[in-house]
Amino acid sequence: RGLGDVYKRQVFLDQQRLGKPKDEADALRMLTDLAGRRHTVCTGVTLRQGQRSLTRAQSTDVYFRPAGREELMAYIRGGEPMDKAGAYGVQGQGALLVERIDGDFFNVMGLPVLLLSRMLAEFGVTLL
């Protein structure tokens, strides 16, 4: 049997989970709250094969630089934030809002590659 997988990226600011924005105003609120501050991105990964299941999580601290309303609205109007937890994607223009990342960059993207490879090894699958 093959392996099934599930990934879930979540963004937390001061213990509050920031989901996907409902609209542009919600995206602006989230990005304004994140601007100039540290937040945490957590990604949960579950692998399944038959009856066997393995779940792990990875956390990474992300520091946003200060950003003004006009700059944030320009980003929002591009559409990138609307389908992303925390209203940004580090792999796109959202990278311009990030000042520093402490931890796994790929986790911030939503796929902690090293964690996934270690989990796959527990199922006997090696990537290198």
Regions found by a protein language model. Give the residues of each.
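Anionic-ligand binding patches
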Residues: 1, 5, 9-128
